[in-house]
C-alpha cells in the first residue's frame, strides 16, 4: 500500500502515518454491527434523538442567523439541512469519535469487504496528513469519519473549505465543517431554492451524504422542522 500511496502523490509524512497504523478491531466490530440503519423511520428518529436535535437546532440557528444565512447565500443549502446533519452526526460536536482516523481507514482498506470503497479515503487521509489538515494521532469515528459532520477523509480533502477565514481547513472547527458540508452538497448537485423532501429535487443529494434511506428521510424531516 505504501508504494501505491507514493504513486498517488503521498509524501513522507503521509507514508510515515501509514506505516504507524494498527489493525482496528473496534472499526471492524462497528462495520459489522450497523443496526440503527435497519430501524423503521419512527424508531430511528426516536433512537437518534430527533426531537432534541430539532430543539437545539432551532436555538443554534436563532443564535447565529448571519452565519447560516451566509452559507445558504454561498452554497444554496438551507440551515435546517446543515444543522440536522451536524446534530445527527456528532450531537453538534459533543462527540466526534475516539478511534485513530488513519488506522480506521487503513483497516477498512485492508478488509476485503469494501476495500475499493475505502482505498481512496485512505489516500485522502494520508494527503491530509501531508497537508497538515490532520496528524497521525487524529481521532474520529469508527469508520475514520472526522470532524463536526463526520467526513470521510477523501471527501474532506477534496471538498474542504476554510469557513472562518483563518487560512486553514480544519473539520474540527465548526465553521469549516459546516461550510465544507454545504460545499459538498452543492458540488453533488444541490439546487438552490428547490425542495429537499422525499420526491423533491434535492432529496437525491441527501442520498450522496448517506446511503441509508432511513437516514435520508430523517435529515429531510428534521431539516424542515428546524427551518420551519
Regions found by a protein language model. Give the residues of each.
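Cell-wall glycan-active module
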Residues: 1-112, 127-134, 139, 154-228
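Conserved catalytic neighborhood of penicillin-recognizing serine enzymes
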Residues: 114-118, 122
Amino acid at each position: 500500500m505504501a508504494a501505491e500511496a507514493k504513486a498517488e502523490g503521498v509524501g513522507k509524512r503521509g507514508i510515515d502515518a501509514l506505516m504507524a497504523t494498527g489493525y482496528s478491531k473496534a472499526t471492524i466490530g462497528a462495520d459489522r454491527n450497523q443496526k440503527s440503519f435497519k430501524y423503521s423511520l419512527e424508531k430511528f428518529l426516536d433512537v437518534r434523538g430527533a426531537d432534541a436535535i430539532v430543539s437545539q437546532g432551532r436555538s443554534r440557528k436563532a443564535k447565529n442567523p448571519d452565519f447560516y444565512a451566509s452559507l445558504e447565500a454561498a452554497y444554496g443549502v438551507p440551515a435546517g439541512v446543515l444543522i440536522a446533519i451536524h446534530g445527527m452526526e456528532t450531537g453538534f460536536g459533543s462527540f466526534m469519535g475516539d478511534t485513530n482516523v488513519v488506522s480506521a481507514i487503513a483497516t477498512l482498506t485492508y478488509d476485503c469487504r469494501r476495500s475499493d470503497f475505502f482505498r481512496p479515503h485512505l489516500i485522502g487521509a494520508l494527503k491530509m496528513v501531508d497537508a497538515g489538515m490532520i496528524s497521525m494521532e487524529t481521532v474520529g469515528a469508527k469508520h475514520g469519519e472526522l470532524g463536526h459532520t463526520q467526513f470521510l477523509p477523501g471527501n474532506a480533502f477534496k471538498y474542504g473549505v476554510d469557513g472562518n477565514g483563518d487560512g486553514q481547513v480544519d473539520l474540527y472547527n465548526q465553521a469549516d465543517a459546516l461550510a465544507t458540508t454545504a460545499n459538498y452538497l452543492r458540488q453533488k448537485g444541490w439546487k438552490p431554492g428547490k425542495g429537499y423532501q422525499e420526491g423533491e429535487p434535492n432529496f437525491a443529494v441527501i442520498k450522496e451524504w448517506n446511503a441509508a434511506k432511513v437516514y435520508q428521510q430523517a435529515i429531510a424531516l428534521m431539516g424542515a422542522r428546524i427551518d420551519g
